[in-house]
Amino acid sequence: MTSHPNQSPALTSYFSRLERRQGVSKPRAFVASAEGAALCSWGDTTLPLALGGVTRFFTLAMVLREVDRGALTLETPVADILSPHHIAGLCVVGGVDHSNSITIGHLLSHRSGIADYFSPPHKRVNTLRDQILRSDRSWSVEQALEIARHYPGAFIPGTARHVNFSRTNYLLLGEVLTKSTGMSFDALVDLRIISPLGLKRTYVFTRDYYDRYFSLAPVTNGATPLHIPQALASFGADGALISSAADTVAFLRGFWNGALCDKSWLETITAHPLRSSTAPPLSVGVMIAPLPGTSTGLGAQADPTGIAAGINIQTGVCAMVSTHRVGTLQGAMKDLVALMAIV
């Protein structure tokens, strides 16, 4: 086990438990106060990691910035931004296409009803998730949307008392950002997040970076390392960000401090979370989890590859933890909550 003599016994015990898990060898974590003081550092916090679903936090920040500047609202119909061929047929319920009623807010909060292109709910389907666990492959946004159209909408957009977690939502938000700004997703991340915050180890993984894949912290499925550069580049606004633990926490602090979008959004994006059968409770753009023994909660994003990052809604303490092992969204969130409860 990695030696960290300055960490508390509780933190040492926490990381020891992570390292004893099958397939986990070098977990990484970084925690900082809202002011930037390091509260916990474990492993190499400068090593680049594939953030997976934590990318959605970055996408959220850029969408909220578009709302701040008046280009969008949460009530803006997606059909007002994207062309009909993007939208048509994405949420058909009872034979009626409700896709034109999907709003920006519905996409952010997973209340669009659109099926998850990556891991649709039907059994006996050879999903993209199953495929990339066996061998690498790529896909386009258009192909992902076509997969989603094969499945009925989970509900009429905005009407259900629960959410339907769907990676398709954030692929669409990436397309919305490209349309509303006239910039590619990777260029926008550089302009709106990387440059203002001075992040040195953060970038969007595209086909231009295939040769960098082996520089990333390895992710394992059981005992098998995943080699999926094509898939990683295909995730786009839903999962293609590369960053280090330290850079990710710097991003979260920027979000908390209002450097990326108006700070008043924190209350909106963490209010009234709704349950999900396949993910932790979701609000507008973040997963919500209570912190044991406190009256506050955690606004976070996570990925089944064992990575999660979030903000203590009350104190602004920001954290990221990664085990680099394929598991579940809920499992990654539990690891983050357990870490935040200690610090």
Regions found by a protein language model. Give the residues of each.
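Short secondary-structure junction motifs
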Residues: 24-26, 69, 73-75, 160
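Extended low-complexity intrinsically disordered regions
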Residues: 1-15, 20, 106-139
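A structural signal for well-ordered alpha-helical segments within the folded catalytic domains
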Residues: 9, 57-61, 76, 102-105, ...
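Catalytic-site signature segments of enzymes, centered on catalytic residues
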Residues: 28-29, 38-41, 48, 92-96, ...
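Active-site helix/loop module of the DD-peptidase/beta-lactamase fold
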Residues: 68-119, 150-151, 175, 179-223, ...
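Active-site SXXK
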Residues: 15, 50-78, 173-178, 248, ...
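Catalytic loop of the DD-peptidase/beta-lactamase superfamily, centered on the K-T-G motif
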Residues: 1-41, 46-50, 80, 178, ...
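Ligand-binding clamshell of periplasmic/extracellular solute-binding protein-like
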Residues: 53, 82, 167
